[in-house]
Swiss-Prot record:
Protein name as catalogued: Large ribosomal subunit protein bL17
Molecular function terms, GO-annotated: structural constituent of ribosome
GO cellular component, one term: cytosolic large ribosomal subunit
Encoding gene per record: rplQ
Family that this chain belongs to: Belongs to the bacterial ribosomal protein bL17 family.
Matches recorded under PANTHER family: LARGE RIBOSOMAL SUBUNIT PROTEIN BL17M, RIBOSOMAL PROTEIN L17
Amino acid sequence: MAYRKLGRTSSQRKAMFRDLTTDLLINESIVTTEARAKEIRKTVEKMITLGKRGNLHARRQAAAFVRNEIASESYDEAKDEYTSTTALQKLFSEIAPRYAERNGGYTRILKTEPRRGDAAPMAIIELV
């Protein structure tokens, strides 16, 4: 299996992929290097496919990979309480139904200008 090492050990690389995948699911668009964008595209597509499957096993598989971060928070004045949505809940309730009719190709990578400090090729990865 071919993959990019990205100058990191395997555990560091896996942690970075988990972080970037979770950030992309929460924000639906992130700016990163081109190599990282091409690598996390694989994991994001797998997570959305799990979300489309929607059964308990798929939810547990996605929960094992996606970080437990708050995607959105709202305040209900009538009940005087805050309600929050995690990245996993957003994946299964908002993102996956959006792509119910689409078979793959859930992300788009747009190349941008090189980073100022080290001229690394940058890209915007976003959900289609």
